[in-house]
């Protein structure tokens, strides 16, 4: 009987060991499967994250390039506006320098000779030019002054003059600002071509 108990104990040990080994193998197999699933999921997630990061990077790059292009366009437009403004200011200064007393006197006399044959006209000058030119114009225009031609000071004119029919709708602006604006509009297409070359 002693052998039987011993055999029985050995059999229980053996069966327990086999069961434990079987259970351990099953646990290991499940752990390996779970680990493989985790690795596959991690690889899939990593791949998705990488694709998402690449897409975001490409989108950011596209937006950055578009923003850079827009900034360059804005810079070109701003530079062109600044150059135009400088050109226009220089043009106005040049025209104003040409409008000295001699030039104004000669221009007013020519305009009056051509235009005032049958019309009554008003000529408006700035106050400074009015004071400087009135006596010279009286001498040159003579008896037509005050009757057919009236010369008046006007604060709104910096350099040059305006001329208009007294009772009519005709009005001409020979101010330095207007002449400079007309010249600028005439020169503007040529100016744009020069800027494009730069």
Swiss-Prot record:
GO terms for molecular function: ATP binding; proton-transporting ATP synthase activity, rotational mechanism; proton-transporting ATPase activity, rotational mechanism. One of its GO terms (cellular component) is proton-transporting two-sector ATPase complex, catalytic domain. One of its GO terms (biological process) is proton motive force-driven plasma membrane ATP synthesis. Coiled coil: none annotated. This is V-type proton ATPase subunit E. Transmembrane segments: none annotated. HAMAP family: ATP_synth_E_arch. Keywords: ATP synthesis, Hydrogen ion transport, Ion transport, Transport. Produces ATP from ADP in the presence of a proton gradient across the membrane. Gene3D superfamilies: 1.20.5.2950. InterPro entries: ATPase_V1_Esu. Belongs to the V-ATPase E subunit family. The keyword Membrane does not apply. The keyword Transport applies.
């Amino acid at each position: 009987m002693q052998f039987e108990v011993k055999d029985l104990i050995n059999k229980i040990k053996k069966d327990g060991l086999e069961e434990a080994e079987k259970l351990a193998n099953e646990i290991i197999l499940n752990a390996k499967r779970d680990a493989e699933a985790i690795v596959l999921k991690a690889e899939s997630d990593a791949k998705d994250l990488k694709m998402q990061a690449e897409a975001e990077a490409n989108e950011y790059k596209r937006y950055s390039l578009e923003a850079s292009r827009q900034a360059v366009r804005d810079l070109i437009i701003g530079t062109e506006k600044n150059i135009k403004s400088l050109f226009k200011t220089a043009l106005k200064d040049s025209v104003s320098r040409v409008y000295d007393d001699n030039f104004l006197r000669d221009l007013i006399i020519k305009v009056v000779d051509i235009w005032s044959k049958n019309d009554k006209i008003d000529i408006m000058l700035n106050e400074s030019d009015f004071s400087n030119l009135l006596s010279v114009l009286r001498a040159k225009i003579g008896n037509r002054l005050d009757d057919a031609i009236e010369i008046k000071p006007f604060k709104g004119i910096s350099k040059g003059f305006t001329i208009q029919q007294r009772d009519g709708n005709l009005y001409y602006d020979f101010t330095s600002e207007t002449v400079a604006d007309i010249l600028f509009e005439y020169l503007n297409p040529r100016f744009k071509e020069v800027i494009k070359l730069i």
